[in-house]
C-alpha cells in the first residue's frame, strides 16, 4: 500500500510540473539580432542535450546514425547557442535538467521531447507515436526524471563534446 501511495505522490508532482510544450518567447527572440536566429536559414528542429553527459552523447551519436536525412540539428545545453535557445524557449539559460527539442514555434521538454525526436526518425516513428498515445505524460516524465537525475551516476561525465568535422553542419555554431 505504501508503494502505491508513493507512486501516486510522484505522479501528482510530475503532473504539476510545467507543461512539456512551451511556446517560444517571441519578445525575447525579437530583441536578438536576426543573425543570431538559428532558424533563419534552416528550420530543422534543434535538440539541446547535456554536452558533458556520456549517456546523452551516446544518444546523440545514435540519433545522428539514424537520421541520414538530417532532420535534426544539435547544440549542447552548456554552449552559448544552447543557452540562447533555452532562453528563447522560456527556460533559464543554465537549466540543464532536461533535453529540449526546439522548433521555430515551440519547445518540447523531458519525455515529450524524446518522443517528438523519435517521431522524426523513421526507425522509431511507429514506437514513439504509440508510446505518446498510450503512456500518460506524468508516468513518462517521472521515468525521464529518474534517469535524468541519475545520468552522471549511470554513465559518468566526459569532456565537453566537440562536433565531428564531418557533421559540423548538424551542430549549431558555438559562436
Language-model regions, residue ranges each:
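N-terminal G-site of the GST-like fold
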Residues: 51, 66-92
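N-terminal mitochondrial targeting presequences
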Residues: 16, 26-36
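Local sequence-structure signature of Cys/Sec-based thiol-disulfide redox active-site neighborhoods
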Residues: 37-67
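Thiol/selenol-based redox catalytic cores and closely related redox-interacting motifs
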Residues: 80-175
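A structure-centric signal for secondary-structure junctions around beta-strands
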Residues: 43-44, 71, 95-96
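Compositionally biased, low-complexity peptide segments typical
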Residues: 22-25, 152
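N-terminal chloroplast transit peptides
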Residues: 1-21
Amino acid at each position: 500500500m505504501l508503494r502505491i501511495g508513493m507512486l501516486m505522490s510522484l505522479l501528482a508532482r510530475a503532473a504539476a510540473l510545467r507543461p512539456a510544450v512551451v511556446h517560444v518567447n517571441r519578445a525575447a527572440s525579437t530583441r536578438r539580432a536576426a543573425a543570431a536566429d538559428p532558424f533563419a536559414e534552416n528550420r530543422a528542429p534543434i535538440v539541446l542535450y547535456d554536452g558533458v553527459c556520456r549517456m546523452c552523447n551516446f544518444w546523440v551519436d545514435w540519433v545522428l546514425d539514424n537520421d541520414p536525412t538530417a532532420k535534426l540539428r544539435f547544440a549542447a545545453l552548456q554552449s552559448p547557442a544552447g543557452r540562447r535557445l533555452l532562453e528563447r524557449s522560456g527556460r533559464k539559460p543554465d537549466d540543464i535538467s532536461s533535453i529540449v527539442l526546439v522548433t521555430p514555434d515551440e519547445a518540447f521538454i523531458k519525455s515529450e521531447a524524446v518522443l517528438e525526436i523519435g517521431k522524426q526518425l523513421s526507425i522509431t516513428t511507429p514506437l514513439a507515436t504509440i508510446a505518446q498515445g498510450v503512456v500518460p505524460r506524468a508516468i513518462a516524465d517521472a521515468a525521464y526524471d529518474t534517469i535524468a537525475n541519475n545520468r552522471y551516476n549511470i554513465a559518468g561525465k566526459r569532456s565537453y563534446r566537440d562536433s565531428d568535422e564531418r557533421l559540423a553542419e548538424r551542430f549549431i555554431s558555438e559562436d
